[in-house]
Amino acid sequence: GGMKHLPVQEELLHIINECNLMYWCSTIMRCAYQFISAKVEEKGEPPFEIPNLRFLSMAKLQKGESISPMITLGYMLEEMIHGDFVKYIHNGHPVPCTEPPLSDEEYKIAEFLCFTQHVQYLQTKGLAFISDYQGSGNLLTDPQILTSDLGVDMFGLGNVKEGFNRFTTEHSCNKYCKWFELDSLAHPSTAAAL
C-alpha cells in the first residue's frame, strides 16, 4: 500500500508532536556535545574522531485560511536527506544495529551514538535518552526519546518502556565512554549526573 493520511485534525496534532520531538532531541543532543566540548577542553583531543552529527531541520507550516471553521490544514517541512538511509540504533536495544550490517564508518557513528545515550542518561539523572537513531551522513531524523515512567507517550509514540528499563544492563561502555570518563551505569538513584 501507499502512503496514508490521518484525518486532518489528527494529522495536524501528529505534525506538532513530531516537531516538538525533534526540538527536544536537538536540544538534548546539543547538551551532549557541550559535555564533549568541555571534556576535550579539559583533557585535550581524544585519540579518535568525534562525529559531527545533528538532527535535520524541521518546521510546521499551517495554511492561513481553513477549509472550514473546524479544520486547519498543516504540513511538516523537513530538510532533504541525501544518500543511503541508515538505522544506527533501534529504540528497543541500546546497541548498534546489526541488520542490515553497518559499514565500518556507520558502525563508528552507531558506537558514538551509544555513547551519547550514556551521556544523556547521566545528564537527565536516569530519566531519559534519545534512541531510534537513524539518518544519512551527518543528519539524523525520526528519533524517539525513551523515558522512565514519567508519563505515557510523553515525547511520542515510540517510547518503548522495555527499552528504557533494559538500558542500564544492555548498554556496553565503549572507547568513547571510557575516554570521556563516564560513570558506569547504575540504578538511576545512584547514577551521578554530569
Language model features with spans:
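Catalytic-loop of the protein kinase fold
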Residues: 111-113, 117-148
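Conserved structural core of kinase catalytic domains
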Residues: 1-110, 140-194
